[in-house]
Amino acid sequence: MTLIKSISGIRGTIGGRTGDTLNPLDIVKFTTAYAQFIGGKKIVVGRDGRISGLMVRNVVVGTLMGMGYDVIDIGYATTPTTELAVRMAGADGGIIITASHNPRQWNALKLLNSEGEFLTAADGAEVLRLAEAEDFNYAEVDKLGTCTIDDSYNQRHIDSVLALKLVDREAISKRKFRVCVDTINSVGGIILPDLFKALGVDYEILNGDCTGDFAHNPEPLEKNLHGIMDKMKQGGFDLGIVVDPDVDRLAFICEDGTMFGEEYTLVSVADYVLSHTAGNTVSNLSSTRALRDVTEKHGGKYTAAAVGEVNVTTKMKEVGAVIGGEGNGGVIYPESHYGRDALVGIALFLSSLAQRSAEGRLQGKKGCKVSELRATFPDYQIAKNRIDLTPETDVDAILVKVKEMFAQDGSAQVNDIDGVKIDFPDRWVHLRKSNTEPIIRVYSEAQTMEQADELGKQLMQVVYDMQ
C-alpha cells in the first residue's frame, strides 16, 4: 500500500489504513488545502476511467462545495480536456482525478491553476504545508457551493484541435487513413472516436470500454503493447495509436507492427510544426537528442529543461518555443495550450503524414508510410537503468562528485539543473535521484542500444566506487 504526497499532487493505492494509502480522509484534507490556497469561487473537476474514480470524485466535489466553491463536473475527461476546460470556463483552478499511467489500483489528484496548468513547485509546496497544518475553515450553510454537470468539454476540446492552423483536415480526409487504436479501457475510448470521425479517419478501437479495468499495463511502452502490435502485423492499417489512461501520452506503431518509438512522437510532430513555423523547441533532459537535431535542421534553437511537465512549460515560455514536450510521448503545443495533449499530437501527426503522402503522389509514389517517415529522423537508442542505494546514502553529495569529475575532465558538457547530465559529442547520460525512493535513475543515449547501455553501466560503476 502506498501514499505519496508531493508538490505535484497526492497519489496512492486505494484501500487500507489511513496515512498509508489514498483514502477519503487524505482526499478531504488535500482538497481542502488546495481550495484554501487557490482562492476564488469556481473549480473544474474531471476524471479518467479508473474504477475508483467515482468514489474519489464524490469526495473531492463534496469537499469543494463544503469550502464554498461552485464545481463544474465535466465527468469522464482526459487530462488535456480538463486543462482546457479551466480556461474555457473561466475557472479559478481545476482538479484532475487520474493516476496517469499507473496501474488500476492507483489514483491521484493533479492540481491546476487558473490557466489550466500544473502548479509550480512553490505553489505545490504551499498546498502541502496547508494540508499538514489542517487549519481549515469551511463555509457556513448559506454559503455552500454548488455542483454543475457539464459534459460538453470533450466536444469543445475536439473543436479546439480542429481549429488549429496546422491541423490539415482536408489532407487527412483525402488520405483516407485507417488506424488501429488502443485506449486501455479509459477515457480515450470516449473522445478519440469523435476526433477520428471529425477528421475523416476510419478507425478500429481496441480496449475501448471506459471501465478502468485496464487490459494491460497502462504505460505505453513496447513491452506492454504486443496486442496492438500483433494486430498491426496482420495488415490493413496505416497507423497504430496508443494512449495512456488520461490521454496525455501518445505512442505510434508503424504499419508493419514495429514501434515508431515513444521518444519520436515529439520529434515527428516537432519536425512538422517547425517546417511551417520557425522557432525554438524544449524537452526535458532525459529526452532524445533527435529533437535537438531536428530543431537545428530547421534553424531553431533547442533548450533542455528539468524533468517534469511544469518545468518544460516554464522553459518553453522563457525561450518562446513553438513546440515542446517530453520523450515519454508528451506533446505540448502552445497554439493549443501549455499541457501534454495526445489529441493535438494525433492531429498534427496525421497532418504531417497526409501532406507527405500527397507530395509523394505528385512525384509518382504511392504515398508515405509511417515506417518511411520514421526513417527520415536521426536514430538514437535510450537505455534506462537504476542504482539502488541505502536510505542513509547522501545522493546529492554523490551527484556533486560526479559533476565535478566530468567538469574537470573537459571531454563533455555538464548540466546540473536536474541531477547531472553529461553530454558527450555522440552520446549522453543523465543521473537524477528519485523523490520517492533511495535510488538514482540512469538514462543514457547513443546510436545503438549496446552503446547506450554500456555508457549507463560505466556511470553506475563510477557511483558504486564513490560509496
Language-model regions: role of each:
Residues 1-68, 146-179:
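An N-terminal, well-structured beta->alpha segment
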Residues 2, 13, 107-233:
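Gly/Ser/Thr-enriched, mixed-charge loops and adjacent short helices
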Residues 32, 36-37, 42-106, 194-253:
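N-terminal small/polar loop signature for handling phosphorylated ligands or for N-terminal nucleophile
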Residues 46-48, 181-183, 254, 335, ...:
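Short glycine-centered, acidic/aromatic-flanked micro-motifs in structured strand/loop junctions
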Residues 74, 125-159, 163, 254-327, ...:
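Proline/glycine-rich low-complexity loops and linkers
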Residues 111-114, 251-255, 332-334:
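Short beta-strand-to-turn element immediately C-terminal to the catalytic PLP-Schiff-base lysine
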